[in-house]
Amino acid sequence: MSDTYVDVGYSSSTVGFGRKAGVLVVDWQLAFTDPRFELGGLERLHRARDNTAELLKTARAASLPVAACYTAYCSTKDMPLWKVAAVRREFFYGHDCTAMDPKIHDPSDFTYCKNAPSMFFQTPLITWIVREGIDTVFVTGCTTSGCVRATVVDAFSYGLRVQVVADCCGDAEQG
């Protein structure tokens, strides 16, 4: 964090960890990790995906609950106004790009489809979090500036303790 933020009191206190943690996995689907797809050839996303796979091994071994989402639509009629052409062309139910990356996916995870940037927006996620008794979330996924950011903001807004796992988040742009 830059000195400017520190000087005005950012990070002057911490939220710490609560009683029970869970891991949120945002959009680690083949569209972003498989070079066959327009958005899938970025090395920094592959590194973050591989780091996420390692984190998930540890989390699952510790019996932490994991929720994972992917993005897909029935048609352009139920799709937000994405400016990303590849999303408008490929992100439809049944398209290979919407499948979860096999390095990430585990059948024991709570996996569902979302249709907006946040994992929370009009999805069953908060119900699952309450049922699991989760009060702290570790957020992983892509893209950091879009869907990860939206998920983090909503998690914070729901009163959860939010930990962004930087090495497990990726974006088209560095920084």
Where does each model-flagged region fall?
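Hydrophobic beta-strand scaffold residues
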Residues: 66, 111, 162-164
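Glycine-centered short loops/turns at secondary-structure junctions
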Residues: 61-64, 133, 159
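Active-site acidic carboxylates
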Residues: 1-106
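Short Gly/Thr/Asp-enriched flexible loops that form oxyanion-binding sites at enzyme active sites
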Residues: 148-158
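A short glycine-rich beta-strand->turn/loop micro-motif centered on a GG-aromatic cluster
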Residues: 138-141, 156, 161-174
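Internal catalytic-core helix/loop-beta-alpha segment
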Residues: 94-142
